[in-house]
C-alpha cells in the first residue's frame, strides 16, 4: 500500500511532494533509499555539515527533506518540532503500509534500576507464555533472543521500526528502558504505553 505524507500529517504544505507516495523516513543520509523522506536534525557538533547531509540525501533519491531549521534546499519543509513528531509519523506510516497488532508497552525510567526492572517484567510476562520484547542497555529483542543495542533508548525511527518488527514476530508486550535523555529528545513519542514505572528519584 502506498501513502503520502499528507495522509500522515494532514496540514497544508504548498509542495508537490506532500501529496506523492513516499517510502518511509530516514535520519542517515548514507542510508537513504529512493522515495524516502530525509529528516534533517540539527547537528550541534557539525553544524556546517547539516546542509551537505540533506543535499546528499536529495542527490541519492530522497523525495523531500524535513528540517529543524532552514537549509535553503529544494523540496525542503522546515518543521522546528520534527524531532518530537517523527516517532508518531513513523508509527503511523508503518501501521498504514503493514498493519500489525500494536504491542502493549511498559516503560521504565529512573536514575537506577531501569535495566533490572524491565528485564524482570519481560521475564515474568514470558513465563506466562506471552511473547514479550525487551529493549534497553543489555540488548533488544524478544526473549530470550537479544541483539546488542547502541543506545539505552533507540532514536524514534529505529524504536518504532523495532516495535513493529517484534509485533510481526509474535510479541504481545514490550518492556523498555526510557532514559532521561531519550525522553527529553522525544524518542518514545508515538509509543502507546499502558504502564510507566518510575524506579527512584
Model-assigned labels for residue ranges:
Residues 1-92:
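N-terminal leader/targeting and accessory segments in enzymes
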Residues 87-201:
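Phosphate-binding loop of NTP-binding sites
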Amino acid at each position: 500500500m502506498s501513502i503520502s505524507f499528507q495522509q500522515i500529517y494532514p496540514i497544508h504544505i504548498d509542495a508537490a511532494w506532500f501529496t506523492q507516495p513516499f517510502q518511509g523516513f530516514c535520519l542517515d543520509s548514507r542510508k537513504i533509499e529512493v522515495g524516502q523522506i530525509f529528516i534533517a536534525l540539527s547537528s550541534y557538533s557539525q553544524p556546517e555539515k547539516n546542509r551537505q547531509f540533506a543535499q546528499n540525501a536529495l542527490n541519492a533519491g530522497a523525495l523531500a527533506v524535513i528540517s529543524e531549521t532552514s537549509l535553503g534546499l529544494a523540496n525542503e519543509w522546515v518543521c522546528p518540532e520534527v524531532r518530537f513528531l517523527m516517532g508518531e509519523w513513523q508509527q503511523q506510516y508503518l501501521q498504514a503500509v503493514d498493519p500489525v497488532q500494536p504491542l502493549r508497552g511498559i516503560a521504565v525510567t529512573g536514575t537506577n534500576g531501569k535495566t533490572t526492572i524491565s528485564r524482570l517484567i519481560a521475564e515474568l510476562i514470558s513465563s506466562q507464555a506471552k511473547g514479550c520484547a525487551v529493549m534497553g542497555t543489555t540488548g533488544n529483542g524478544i526473549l530470550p533472543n537479544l541483539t546488542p543495542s547502541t543506545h539505552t533508548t533507540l532514536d524514534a525511527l529505529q524504536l518504532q521500526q523495532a516495535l513493529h518488527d517484534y509485533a510481526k514476530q509474535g510479541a504481545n508486550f514490550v518492556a523498555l528502558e526510557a532514559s532521561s535523555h531519550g525522553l527529553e529528545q522525544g524518542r518514545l513519542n508515538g509509543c502507546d504505553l499502558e504502564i510507566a514505572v518510575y524506579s527512584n528519584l
